[in-house]
């Protein structure tokens, strides 16, 4: 197939530029490697170079009045090109034209633009982008050039074959304008001459506008995390390659995959752009450079430190340097997965044992303060213990961990409470009186004491504290009540407190020498209260002793049974003996299959039944005799 150009003369100004093939709509996608055999033919490079030179000379010397005649000459030259190409078809190769949308020169509509192909020397040769200025006749034909601040950029590329240096000079605005302006509004003066380069793209001068973002290809199995980087820079277009050099291109692709993180080749030349074509295709130019992670990191305890690079422990936000992002967290709000999990809480109040205060009515406030201070000092200085309450229940085992108890940073710590308890070796020394007084300090650092009146103080019976301790609530303290206030009726008018003070309990007049310290028994432990009720089954020996005592004494004298057979057994009460006898009677009256508990010999059960019948009948006789005697007494009284 021969490269053909069609020059159409006409239009509003009498001249039309040659049609330049446009890039396909799917240029962002991967260019198919299949091409027809017609496109792989080689053209006569020398002939095209000479014709291009003639066209350039004619275009420079032409004017707007001679455009029509030059159009006819171009048709003649087009036919001549076709004829000469057919003659040199089998001798020299020719590279097909292509359109590079990433090159601004391909977007211009300059007249008589032609493509020249030089003999292929090596697949390592880089392309040359060369532009030469043309006359201003094109601007008279209605075209517009770039307006604004223009910067000049020069790129020189070395050739291996001819050792030639080509200066690539062009004018360029902001690269974002290249996407917004149409080909009719963008003009870059000059013709373009391209050298054959199957591995390169003829826009090496646009290196500053390519996508050179590195994508880390390492992928760990433990932490699969990738990111995509979008770019708003100019997209590059890879031209179609020749069929004859497909093997060379495949070898270059294999080499480029190994050097995907390098910017230049080892020999110092520019790197082929198609190595990064996957970075350029498929992304919209208006998207910002953003990192999108495929996996969302959880904020419930998982902390990842970013130290650059992509691995199972880090993610880099930049191709060159990673930024560190340390995760901070609070142990009181989120659950931690580390072994150093800590539970943080604040103690607003403590429960203290009950303090009963006794003061005479004639005592001064200073004496009352000293008395309370001595009581509190005796409590705190004598040794105290700390109690822990979880959901209102006291935790008694000190060896349990916080997680076993139900306390962790993930749980609500509002269910946690503490109490102050007197030590085992000391007893609280409160002050007791017939009319105790309740003190409510307003300062948050002071303790509050609770008083309770009890008639047991007069008889000398020790006053046990209440079962429930009282919580010190800072918000419920009485304002302006820093001191204990006696009853207003017993205080002189000049010494009466202000109206906002409140008398809690009236204090009766007592002599000053009546002040005394009465120790109050320590609150009995639950274990001691329930120790007697612990189930202690009767042994066979105890059952035999019980049966013998009942046979002698009877079933109505359990205290005598206790003194006769269980005098030294302090854990056996007469009530226990009575309950056990009833159980034995019931066990003996049922079948052996229905019996539960420890087995009792059948001989003892028979004795139980015999004793039970005997004493039942004896009791009935006693009741009958008593009724007869009562009847006789009543009749004798009535006869009188």
UniProtKB/Swiss-Prot annotation:
- Provide the free-text tissue specificity comment from this protein's UniProt record: Expressed ubiquitously. Highest expression in flowers and roots.
Q: What InterPro entries does the record tag this protein with?
A: Homeodomain-like_sf, Myb_dom, SANT/Myb, TRP_plant, Ubiquitin-like_dom
Name the keywords, alphabetized.
DNA-binding, Nucleus, Transcription, Transcription regulation
Question: Source gene?
Answer: TRP4
Q: Outcome of mutating residue 607 to I, per the record? A: 80% decrease in telomere binding
Q: Quick one: where's region Disordered?
A: 442-464
Q: Which organism is it from?
A: Arabidopsis thaliana
Q: What happens when the gene is disrupted?
A: Viable, but deregulation of telomere length control.
> Would you kindly state one Gene Ontology biological process term found in this protein's UniProt entry?
telomere maintenance
Span of domain Ubiquitin-like: 343-422
Domain HTH myb-type, which positions? 530-589
Q: Where in the cell is it found?
A: Nucleus
The UniProt record describes its induction as: By salt stress.
The record's comment about this protein's domains reads: The Myb-extension domain (593-622) is critical for telomere binding.
Residue ranges of the annotated DNA-binding region, renumbered to this chain: 558-585
**What does the entry list under GO cellular component?**
chromosome, telomeric region; nucleus
Q: What's the name of the protein?
A: Telomere repeat-binding protein 4
| Subunit structure comment from the entry | Homomultimer. Interacts with SNL1 (via PAH2). Interacts with STO.
**Function summary:** Binds specifically to the plant telomeric double-stranded DNA sequences 5'-TTTAGGG-3'. At least 2 repeats of telomeric sequences are required for binding. Induces DNA bending.
Indicate the principal place this protein occupies in or around the cell. Answer: nucleus
């Amino acid at each position: 197939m021969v490269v053909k150009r069609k020059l159409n003369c006409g239009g509003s100004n009498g001249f039309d530029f040659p049609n330049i093939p446009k890039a396909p709509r799917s240029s962002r996608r991967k260019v198919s490697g299949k091409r027809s055999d017609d496109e792989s033919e080689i053209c006569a490079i020398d002939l095209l170079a000479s014709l291009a030179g003639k066209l350039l000379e004619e275009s420079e010397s032409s004017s707007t009045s001679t455009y029509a005649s030059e159009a006819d000459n171009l048709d003649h030259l087009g036919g001549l090109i076709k004829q000469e190409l057919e003659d040199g078809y089998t001798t020299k190769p020719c590279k097909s034209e292509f359109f590079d949308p990433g090159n601004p020169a391909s977007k211009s509509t300059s007249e008589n633009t032609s493509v020249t192909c030089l003999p292929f020397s090596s697949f390592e040769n880089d392309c040359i982008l060369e532009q030469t200025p043309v006359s201003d006749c094109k601007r008279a034909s209605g075209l517009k050039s770039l307006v604004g601040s223009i910067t000049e950029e020069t790129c020189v590329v070395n050739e291996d074959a001819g050792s030639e240096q080509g200066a690539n000079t062009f004018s360029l605005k902001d690269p974002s304008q290249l996407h917004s302006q149409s080909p009719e509004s963008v003009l870059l003066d000059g013709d373009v001459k391209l050298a054959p380069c199957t591995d390169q793209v003829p826009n090496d001068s646009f290196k500053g506008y390519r996508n050179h973002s590195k994508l880390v290809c390492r992928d760990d199995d433990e932490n699969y995390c990738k990111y995509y980087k979008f770019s708003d820079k100019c997209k590059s277009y890879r031209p179609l390659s020749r069929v004859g050099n497909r093997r060379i291109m495949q070898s270059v692709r294999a080499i480029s995959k190994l050097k995907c993180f390098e910017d230049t080749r080892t020999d110092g030349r520019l790197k082929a752009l198609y190595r990064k074509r996957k970075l350029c295709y498929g992304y919209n130019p208006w998207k910002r450079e953003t990192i999108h992670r495929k996996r969302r990191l959880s904020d419930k305890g998982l902390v990842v430190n970013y130290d650059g690079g992509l691995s199972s422990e880090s993610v880099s936000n930049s191709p060159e340097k990673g930024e560190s992002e340390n995760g901070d967290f609070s142990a009181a709000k989120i659950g931690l997965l580390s072994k150093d999990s800590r539970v943080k809480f604040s103690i607003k109040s403590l429960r203290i044992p009950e303090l009963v205060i006794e003061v005479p009515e004639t005592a001064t406030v200073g004496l009352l303060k000293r008395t309370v201070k001595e009581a509190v000092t005796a409590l705190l200085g004598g040794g105290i213990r700390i109690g822990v309450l979880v959901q209102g229940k006291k935790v008694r085992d000190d060896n349990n961990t916080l997680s076993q108890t139900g306390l962790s940073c993930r749980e609500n710590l509002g269910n946690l409470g503490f109490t102050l308890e007197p030590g085992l070796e000391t007893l609280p020394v409160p002050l007791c009186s017939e009319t105790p007084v309740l003190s409510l300090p307003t300062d948050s650092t002071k303790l509050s004491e609770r008083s309770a009146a009890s008639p047991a103080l007069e008889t000398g019976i020790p006053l046990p504290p209440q079962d429930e301790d009282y919580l010190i609530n800072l918000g419920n303290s009485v304002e302006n009540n820093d001191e204990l206030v006696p009853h207003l009726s017993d205080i002189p008018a000049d010494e009466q407190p202000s109206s906002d003070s409140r008398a809690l309990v009236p204090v009766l007049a007592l002599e000053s020498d009546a002040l005394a310290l009465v120790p109050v028994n320590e609150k009995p432990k639950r274990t001691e209260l329930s120790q007697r009720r612990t189930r202690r089954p009767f042994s066979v020996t105890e059952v035999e002793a019980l049966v013998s005592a009942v046979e002698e004494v009877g079933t109505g004298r359990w205290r005598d049974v206790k003194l006769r057979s269980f005098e030294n057994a302090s854990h056996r009460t007469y009530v226990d003996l009575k309950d056990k006898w009833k159980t034995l009677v019931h066990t003996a009256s049922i079948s052996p299959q229905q019996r539960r508990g420890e087995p009792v010999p059948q001989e003892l059960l028979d004795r139980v039944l015999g004793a039970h019948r005997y004493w039942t009948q004896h009791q009935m006789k006693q009741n009958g005799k008593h009724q007869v005697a009562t009847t006789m007494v009543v009749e004798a009284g009535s006869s009188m």
